[in-house]
Amino acid sequence: MNLKPILISILGLSISLETLSQIPENLKSELVILQVETLEEKTILLESRHFEAPNWSREGDYLLINAAGKLEKISLDGTHLGEVFPDLISRVNNDHGLSFDGKTLVFSRNDEGLSSRIYTIPIKGGKPKLITENYPSYWHGISPDGKTLVYCAERNGEWDIWAIPTKGGKEIRLTEEPGLDDGPEYSYDGKYIYFNSHRTGRMQVYRMKADGSEQEQLTFDNLDNWFPHPSPDNNSIVYISYLEDQKGAHPFGKDVKLRLMDLNTRNIKDLTQVFYGGQGTINVHSWSPDGKWIAFVRYHR
């Protein structure tokens, strides 16, 4: 079963057929930052349009979101700082982010007539470079040394975690279990890759060594747990939980909440109450550089 959404392009904009059918006409998107210790929330942006998947800049001075196939910079006071490489980047989906040194932007683009493939571009300027010839490939993580990308890809009917040199080259399969493996992201020390997997029949959070060995399940509940993002101090992960079984999918417009796991004790706490979200809420890394805040998108009907 193809568990990643089928994507179409409309006037150069990328959106999944499933998400397109789920977005209400009166939708509002709210860009929020949350203090993980106090649970204080600040609304950065609230607009009557659909945007997704915030990243925090490595300097901490702006947030990066995708909307209508483009990438936009938003300051922490809600000011629109413009599109990122508007003449070079289009058809972007919600899998994008920055290298640890902040010098490289990585993004997944739904190429016309094809499916998602992964590109890089120097943040100071240049031309996008295609990294994955094969498709579909959905980027999620880059190693701390900047040398390796990890991503979810479908090859021969199986959705697994793959790795590839950031400069391009041979891709390496890291997982081989039945069912969808998705959302791979490196810890800040580079020792682990965190990901989510449907291998047990319910989506749960896992981690493995950077070479794919020692795969370990971390969550064991009746929620559907997606997109683990390790903190800068390597002590915790934040992830999104669907309250109901989504059968291996991560749809838009469902009851969800954000949760935090202490990796030393394995204790889990809720960071938010239940809200309307899912696809687009926190698909990619969104920790602030100091590890005190996370960014996410809450939707309103």
Feature-to-residue mapping (PLM):
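Beta-strand C-termini and the immediately following turn/loop, strongest in propeller blades
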Residues: Q22-E25, I44-L45, R58, L63-G69, ...
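Conserved beta-strand position repeated across blades of beta-propeller domains
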Residues: N55, G97, G141-S143, E185, ...
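Residue-level detector of Asp-centered blade-edge/turn motifs that repeat once per structural unit
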Residues: R58-E59, F100-D101, P144-D145, Y188-D189, ...
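Blade-level signature of beta-propeller repeat domains, shared across WD40, Kelch, NHL, RCC1
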Residues: G278-R301
